Amino acid sequence: MRLCIQKGFTLIKLMIAVVIVGVLAAVALPAYQDDMMRATVSEAIVAVGPCKTRITKTIQSAPPGTLIPNNGWGCGETVDSNSVSIVNPSKYVSRVTTTASDPGGNGGTIFIYFRLTDSVLANLMIAMAPCDAAVTRFEDCKQPAYGAKVISWVCGGVNTTRRNKWLPSSCRESTYFR
């Protein structure tokens, strides 16, 4: 009697390989999506770096009593009639706005609005504020007086803690409620 040696993959081996690939994909895809969201949020925060620099320089060099209106820091907040920023700092950011400054040294908070309407990041806003001390929460942050140094910037999500996992670690500790 002659024995027949089978060559190649059997159907069972192929099915096992498909199951293994499916399990790996089920684990890897959510982790990849979280990494993509973190990268998107980080890019938006980096995109407003020049705005942070401009606000810092203005605070450190403006004479006492200077009044700066809402969106008056020169960060590209000019909006058209539809309240859409004319200057888009990145492909993920629809607009950037800033709060007014007053003689008491309040204001200069940057708000970043995301452009993604079909994403879980839709309607996410991030706030960043200059502080006169090394703090990590908005409640403890006060804008430095004009002529003083900006010691730190605090940042966090606005009115939400739901999506804080996508914020950089330096922004997760605080939530700006307004």
Predicted regions and their residues:
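Generic hydrophobic/packing signal
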Residues: 13-22, 54-57, 114, 120, ...
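N-terminal single-pass transmembrane signal-anchor helix
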Residues: 1-51
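Membrane-proximal N-terminal amphipathic helix
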Residues: 34-66, 72-80
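Periplasmic/extracellular, small/polar-rich flexible segments of pilin-like filament-forming proteins
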Residues: 60-178
